[in-house]
Amino acid sequence: MPKVVSAKILLKFRRFDMDIKEIKENARERMKGFCNLCRECDGVWCAGKVPGMGGTGTGNSFKIAHDKLKNIKVVMRTIHSAKNPILETSLFGEKLSFPAIVAPITGTVFNMGGYVSDEEYSNDVVLGALDAGTIAMIGDTGDPKCFEHGINAIKKANGKGIAIIKPRENDEIIKRIKIAEEAGAIAVGIDSDGAGLVTMKLFGQPVGPKSVEDLKILVNSTKLPFIVKGILSVEEAILCAEAGVHTIIVSNHGGRVLNETLAPCEVLEDIVKAVGDKINVLADGSVREGVDILKYLALGAKGVLIGRPIIWGSVGGRQEGVKIILETLKNQLYQSMILTGCDNVNNISSKTIIK
């Protein structure tokens, strides 16, 4: 007689595939007091929660980034031949399944509630992104172990990751660039808008603005593509181009460093017109669904960064959750392209949107 296995044992070992609803429910429970996972992630509930998940001050920079992006509308078109849109693209010499990269985020305890450690989070995002056919950026903070955890995750991914470093003294940045190079990272850079970051002050870590000469030194210190994240003006985009920067990211740091800034989507088009033929331009800011990616591409970005939803993925479903978040965004982008007549992510025009 075959041994009868109880239903309880079967349920214990059975693998249930997660979905977005389950991931978000898990994350909401595990991030109580830090993130409410609001139906509309608009920065209202979490305003002023820095450290935490919100925007600094009254939270207006977060709110503006959300509101301005939502005010951009897409033009629906259904009489066309774009039946099977191409989502694949190449960034930093890597073929990606769609033009989205995981943003650099650290501080799981004081920003996210601590359900996952910084080490676990780094592994989740780097490997989860790889599972989804794209790449993740790892971040830097006052605790040196955070950067170390990110570097170790990049090593596990055979170098498929990007190291973004706080705007420390140049010698400290270069030291970390060399560590990233040894790990096989595909690109390195700084988030220049971290120059006044509150969380760095908590650790007594000196950060500050960079001159064009500083940028030139950093660019020339490595053979890897060099990125500057946190550009919000045409003037600074031009300075980055003059310094030989490979890629800029139009970003207001999720509204977490300076209140009352412009939204990234407000300045993106002008920046692309000014430097888009010289350097790569990516953007971030309130990307919550696939149609948001479409909007940024229509404004001229070559790709976007995904921030807060990736946190939900890690906290709510770990590595698999990150993969599911990214694949959901990819599927939504695919559908949005069909319904707007866009056949390739590399040639989405401004005619796709109305500002």
What are the functions of these language-model segments?
Residues 295-323, 327, 355:
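A compact, surface-exposed functional segment
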Residues 106-117, 163-171, 225-232:
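Active-site mouth loops of central-metabolism enzymes
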